[in-house]
């Protein structure tokens, strides 16, 4: 997927991409809170893997979201330029769902990472994911130009906070420990639902999601360029005021 970047951002990212020496890497994307790199080192093989540390912890404003997103894109550009099929790639962090979805949207056709998720015991564990495409049965959608898709894999979203459009749900809660099987279920639902939208006059899908990073990332990989435009909403200051327009690669209000 082509990144939408300003020219000076792309030039800076291009220069950084030329200094890669290690083919194996860990991509940490975190803007909710910082991830302690020491807490994941025992899971990373080989141990000398390159660390791509895209971390900030200020999320109280549209400015902070946009600032992190610029940093996010610079790392994604470097990954796109350097990743190969035989590379080992880890993904972890505490990002806004919009950012992990964007990561999956951009990198999904490149290679799936090993996900590092934080367990209920406050220790990280590794999740291997191999895509198994299977058509998922989804309900029929109304012939509306704009709809809502709500993916609730952790907590329930207040429906009164949603935009007033026909709304469709994925409500299967994630297991305590994320598995490849569950990630495939989420992927196949998302892709099948958006594929079905193509048969109607739907032009825009408002996506609201509660999920761990691995789930959000896989949702992003399921979204294709031929699908209706997807806007991923961010819950901040008790409202869904801001969203990431995936097609434009831009945070909007």
Where does each model-flagged region fall?
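Long, low-complexity, Lys/Arg-enriched
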Residues: 1-208, 213-253
């Amino acid at each position: 997927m082509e990144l939408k970047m300003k020219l000076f951002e792309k030039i800076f990212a291009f220069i950084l991409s030329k200094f890669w020496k290690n083919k194996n890497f860990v991509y940490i994307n975190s803007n909710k809170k910082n991830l302690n790199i020491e807490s994941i080192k025992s899971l990373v093989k080989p141990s000398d893997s390159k660390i791509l540390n895209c971390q900030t912890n200020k999320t109280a404003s549209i400015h902070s979201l946009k600032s992190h997103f610029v940093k996010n894109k610079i790392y994604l550009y470097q990954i796109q330029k350097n990743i190969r099929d035989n590379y080992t790639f880890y993904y972890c962090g505490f990002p806004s769902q919009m950012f992990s979805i964007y990561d999956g949207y951009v990198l999904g056709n490149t290679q799936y990472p090993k996900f590092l998720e934080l367990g209920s015991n406050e220790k990280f564990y590794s999740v291997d994911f191999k895509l198994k495409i299977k058509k998922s049965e989804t309900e029929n959608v109304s012939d509306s130009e704009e709809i809502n898709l709500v993916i609730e894999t952790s907590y329930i979203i207040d429906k009164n906070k949603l935009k007033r459009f026909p709304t469709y749900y994925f409500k299967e809660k994630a297991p305590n420990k994320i598995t490849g099987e569950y990630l495939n279920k989420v992927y196949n639902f998302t892709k099948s639902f958006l594929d079905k939208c193509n048969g109607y006059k739907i032009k825009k899908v408002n996506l609201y999601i509660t999920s761990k990073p691995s789930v959000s990332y896989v949702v992003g990989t399921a979204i294709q360029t031929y699908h209706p435009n997807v806007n991923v909403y961010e819950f901040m200051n008790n409202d869904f005021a801001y969203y990431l327009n995936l097609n434009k690669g831009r945070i909007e209000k």
